[in-house]
Amino acid sequence: MIGTPYTQGATRAMLLGSGELGKEVAIELQRLGVEVIAVDRYPNAPAMQVAHRSHVINMLDGEALKALIASEKPHLVIPEIEAIATQTLVELEAEGLKVVPTARATRLTMDREGIRRLAAETLALPTSPYVFCDSLTELQAALKVTGIPCVVKPVMSSSGKGQSVIRSPGDVQKAWDYAQSGGRAGEGRIIVEGFIDFDYEITLLTISAVDGIHFCAPIGHRQEDGDYRESWQPQAMSSLALDRAQHIAREVVQNLGGFGLFGVELFIKGDEVYFSEVSPRPHDTGMVTLISQDLSEFALHVRAILGLPVGTIVQRGPSASAVILVEGESSNIGYSGLAEALAQPNTQLRLFAKPEIHGRRRLGVALARGTSIDEALQTALASAGCIKVHFN
C-alpha cells in the first residue's frame, strides 16, 4: 500500500543525491503518490526543486547521514550518486532500513575496485586487464601488466573526473596527478585498465523486478574526456553479442541483488563482450529513454523499487540524446533559444535547472526521434546547439 504525502500514512522515499537523474526519479515517485525527501551536499539541487522537502548534508559523513535518516524515517533510501557513507547504509540495512537496491550493491559499486573484483574474480566475467595502485611507483609497475595505451581512473569518481589515457611513458606522471585530483573522496587508490580496441560501447539497462529480469534495447553512446556526450537507442549489434551482453548483465545484477534498474556498461568487439562497470541506478546515457521508450529508465526504476511489475517495455524506434555542456562561472544561469531548439522535428528538451556552474557542467539534454539513428542523432545535436546559456 502507498500512503498520501504529508499524512501519517505517507510512503517516504529519501534520495541521496539530487542531480538531474534524481530529479526524474523524484518526479516518477510523485506520480505514484510517494513523499520525496531530496538530499545533497549543496542547496537547490535539481531534485530538491521538485521534492516535498530537502536537506543539505555531507553524505560521506556517516553520523550526519544516520541522524538524518533517524529524523525522517524513510521507508526507502535511494542512492543516486557514489559519494555516500555506504558502510553506514550497510549497518542501517541490518537494522531494517530498506536501501535500493541493496546496501551491498551500493557499497560494491561506489568504487571501481569492489565491482571489478566481483565481475572478474568472483563471477569470472570477461573484462580488460587491470591493476589497482596506491602510488606512482605502483602505477609505473602496472604498465607491464596492462601495456600502453591504458586508462587510469580513480576508484571513486564519476562523469570522467580524474580519468585519462596513458599513450606514452611521458603521460604517467600527469595521469597520476589528474587521478589524485579527480576522485570523489580526494586522493587515493586508482585502477589502471588495459585498453580494449572495442568497436563500440553500450549501456544495457537491466531491471530486476517482482516479475523477473528485464532488458531495455541496448544504448550506444559517445564518450569524450570520460563523460557522455551523445547516446542513442537501439544500438545495432549481432544476436550473439546481444545474448552475451544480456548474460553478463543478468549475472551481475542477480549477484548484487534487490529490485531496481541497473546501468550495465559493456565493451563490444565483434561478437565478444567485455564487462566495464555497473551503476545500481539510472544511468546518464539512459536519458535517451525519456523519448525512446513508453517507460523511461526512471519510471522503470521506480516501478521496480516499489515492488510493482514492469511488464513489457515498448521501444519507439530510432532515438538519440545530445548533452548541453557548458563551461563558465555563474550562480545566475539563464537560457535562450528554446523555441529554435524545439522547432527541430520530434524533439524534447530537459533543462536541469542547476543553481550554479564552476567550470564545465552538464546543464541539459536534447532528445530526438527519427527514421534512423543517424537522423535522430543529428536532430538532437542540432536542437542542443540552439540552446544559448547566459551567465547573468
Swiss-Prot record:
It comes from the Bacteria. Its EC number is 6.3.1.21. The keyword Cell inner membrane does not apply. Keywords: ATP-binding, Ligase, Magnesium, Metal-binding, Nucleotide-binding, Purine biosynthesis. One of its GO terms (molecular function) is phosphoribosylglycinamide formyltransferase 2 activity. One of its GO terms (cellular component) is cytosol. It catalyses: N(1)-(5-phospho-beta-D-ribosyl)glycinamide + formate + ATP = N(2)-formyl-N(1)-(5-phospho-beta-D-ribosyl)glycinamide + ADP + phosphate + H(+). Mg(2+) binds at E265, E277. It is an enzyme of class 6 (ligase). GO terms for biological process: 'de novo' IMP biosynthetic process. ATP binds at R112, K153, S158, S159, G160, K161, G162, Q163, E193, G194, F195, I196, E201. Gene3D superfamilies: 3.40.50.20, ATP-grasp fold, A domain (3.30.1490.20), ATP-grasp fold, B domain (3.30.470.20). Pathway: Purine metabolism; IMP biosynthesis via de novo pathway; N(2)-formyl-N(1)-(5-phospho-D-ribosyl)glycinamide from N(1)-(5-phospho-D-ribosyl)glycinamide (formate route): step 1/1. InterPro entries: ATP-grasp, ATP-grasp_carboxylate-amine, ATP_grasp_subdomain_1, PreATP-grasp_dom_sf, PurT, PurT/PurK_preATP-grasp, PurT_C, Rudment_hybrid_motif. Residues 117-306 form the ATP-grasp domain. The keyword Magnesium applies. N(1)-(5-phospho-beta-D-ribosyl)glycinamide binds at E20, L21, E80, D284, K354, R361, R362. Homodimer. Involved in the de novo purine biosynthesis. Catalyzes the transfer of formate to 5-phospho-ribosyl-glycinamide (GAR), producing 5-phospho-ribosyl-N-formylglycinamide (FGAR). Formate is provided by PurU via hydrolysis of 10-formyl-tetrahydrofolate. Belongs to the PurK/PurT family. This is Formate-dependent phosphoribosylglycinamide formyltransferase. It comes from Shewanella amazonensis (strain ATCC BAA-1098 / SB2B). The gene is purT.
